[in-house]
Design a protein with these regions (language model features):
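Exposed beta-strand-loop-beta-strand "reactive/processing" segments of non-cytosolic proteins
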Residues: 56-96
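Conserved small/polar residues in nucleotide/adenosyl-binding loops
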Residues: 186-193
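Second-shell loop/turn segments in exported
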Residues: 35-41, 107-109, 165-173
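Surface-exposed beta-loop interaction hotspot
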Residues: 104-160
Length: 197
């Protein structure tokens, strides 16, 4: 029905106008779109497109934290955090590929706390102590990692960099080396996981 299409288009346009005015005010830019340079207009449109991509894909609100226009040796990308998130641990990057498609790393952000908790539980069981802290950066994961949630996540489905701070009182250097080897075995795929069917 044409009237429904027109209503949807009007609603989308109204949302764009509302978002744009709010965004420009937050960035301390002129809220009158006509006062922006062509470059600023292009960037604002791209930022809106990327934020809406995230919100439509994941069904939650995201807050803008940064944007880089395409350059000779760098892809165009946006950084954002889930509303109320922590910029240090929850930053999501949306990248525009050469063919114009958008990709993101939100699954890595979602999986990180589950992964950190798995490693924390493992070390607590290993030493019988909670005198340590685990920090992880997840560089790759799958949507299946999110769908499966913390109950059934497979550590080897995730690419991470993990740092563990341990109180000197709970272990010796030798025990730390043993823990390192044990963690490597725990987080590495077993031979049966890597066989193809």
């Amino acid at each position: 029905n044409n009237s429904e299409i027109v209503k949807e288009e009007q609603a989308a346009h109204d949302e764009w106008l509302r978002w744009r005015k709010e965004f420009l005010a937050e960035q301390e830019l002129p809220t009158e779109y006509s006062q922006l340079s062509d470059s600023q207009k292009t960037s604002v449109k791209a930022i809106y497109e990327m934020i809406m991509y995230l919100q439509d894909k994941y069904g939650i609100e995201f807050e803008y934290t940064g944007y880089v226009r395409p350059q000779i040796l760098e892809d165009e990308y946006l950084t954002a955090i889930p509303k109320g998130g922590n910029e240090k641990t929850d930053t999501v990057t949306v990248t525009r590929q050469d063919d114009g498609t958008l990709t993101d790393d939100y699954p890595n952000v979602v999986v990180r706390p589950f992964y950190e908790q798995m490693i924390t539980d493992y070390i607590e069981d290993y030493f019988g102590s909670d005198q340590f802290k685990v920090y992880a950066t997840v560089s790759s994961s799958t949507m299946q990692s999110i769908i499966d949630n913390s109950e059934s996540i497979k550590v080897n489905d995730i690419g991470t960099s993990t740092v563990i701070f341990i109180d000197n009182d709970i272990c010796s250097k030798h025990e730390i080396n043993q823990l390192t080897n044990s963690c490597l075995l725990y987080t590495s795929p077993s031979p049966r996981d890597s066989t193809s069917s």
